[in-house]
């Protein structure tokens, strides 16, 4: 993966891109909240090397060195529009979009706003539908009547803690080398990321999700960690029903692709649903290349 910087309406946006220049199909791998493109380098490198995709890992506005959006532009549609500028910057007419958690919501917004540039969406443990915000943990029950926001925040932290043992199975030295710079930058610019968290908690993208599903034009592959406690399996089933696609359940929690970066590749190469999805992506790529009648 090679680092780069793009100018998006006068704001600096950092990204990395695989160096397989002969690849004919582009892909974008969108990160979760408080992460960055570097966290997904190992996964993207496998997708580039084995599937022949030219993979872009952007750092979304406010994260990992990319400049934040001003308050008046802080909305999901602006995030999606920024992706088109990255694609233009790199000369990519269309792309397969993979999104994790917050990035999955951005992926759905991109598919809704720019279907002509979307080859397909791999939606992973995403927050585009509202049920992920309905917390039923101990802290929400104890503090909900008095300070509901605090109860929700503590529940999210407790849910995140359940993923930490899973990360221990990762190749720690490799993970630290790729993820640490992004996490360090995010820690230093925490005030820039807090407004994004507020946006995610305040907004509901169910209508956009429903519209993309009802249109039926774009291939969608929902994937979910079986033991996800941050965005629970019920939210995965909700999303699958809205878009009319079965959810592919994988081993792990919310961060399943980080300790096991080969999982996504294996699903797309060897799983029946993943192979069917990739065939639909190739069909759509051929369709979008055809001249208008």
Where are these regions (language model features)?
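Conserved alpha/beta-hydrolase catalytic His-Asp/Glu region
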Residues: 132-134, 152-215
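Short beta-strand/loop motif that positions the catalytic acidic residue
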Residues: 216, 222-224
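Flexible "cap/lid" loop of the alpha/beta hydrolase fold
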Residues: 112, 119-152
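Active-site loop/oxyanion-hole signature of alpha/beta-hydrolase fold enzymes
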Residues: 54-98
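Conserved HGGG/HGGXW glycine-rich cap/lid loop of the alpha/beta-hydrolase fold
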Residues: 11-67
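Gly/Ala-rich beta-loop-alpha elbow adjacent to hydrolase catalytic centers
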Residues: 99-103, 107
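Acidic catalytic loop of the alpha/beta-hydrolase fold
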Residues: 226-231, 255
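Catalytic active-site module of serine/aspartate enzymes centered on a nucleophile-bearing elbow/loop
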Residues: 244-293
């Amino acid at each position: 993966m090679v680092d780069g910087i793009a100018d998006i309406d006068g704001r600096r946006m950092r990204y990395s891109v695989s160096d397989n220049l002969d690849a004919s199909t582009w892909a974008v791998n969108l990160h979760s909240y408080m992460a960055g493109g570097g966290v997904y380098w190992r996964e993207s490198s496998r997708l580039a090397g084995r599937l022949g995709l030219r993979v872009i890992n952007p750092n979304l506005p406010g994260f990992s060195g990319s400049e934040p959006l001003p308050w008046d532009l802080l909305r999901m549609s602006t995030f999606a529009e920024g992706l088109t500028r990255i694609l233009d910057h790199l000369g990519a007419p269309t792309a397969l979009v993979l999104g994790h958690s917050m990035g999955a919501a951005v992926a759905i917004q991109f598919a809704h706003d720019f279907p002509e540039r979307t080859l397909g969406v791999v939606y992973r443990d995403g927050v585009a539908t509202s049920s992920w915000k309905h917390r039923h943990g101990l802290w929400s029950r104890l503090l909900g009547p008095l300070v509901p926001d605090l109860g929700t925040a503590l529940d999210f932290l407790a849910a995140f803690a359940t993923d930490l043992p899973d990360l221990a199975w990762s190749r720690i030295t490799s993970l630290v080398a790729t993820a640490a710079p992004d996490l360090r930058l995010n820690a230093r610019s925490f005030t820039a990321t807090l407004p994004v968290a507020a946006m995610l908690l305040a907004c509901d993208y169910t209508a956009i999700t429903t519209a993309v599903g009802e249109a039926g034009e774009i291939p969608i592959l929902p994937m979910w960690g079986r033991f996800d406690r941050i965005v629970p399996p019920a939210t995965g089933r909700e999303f699958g029903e809205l878009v009319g696609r079965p959810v592919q359940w994988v081993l792990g929690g919310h961060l399943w692709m980080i300790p096991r970066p080969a999982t996504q590749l294996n699903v797309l190469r060897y799983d029946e649903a993943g192979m069917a999805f990739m065939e639909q992506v190739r069909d759509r790529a051929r369709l979008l290349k055809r001249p208008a009648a």
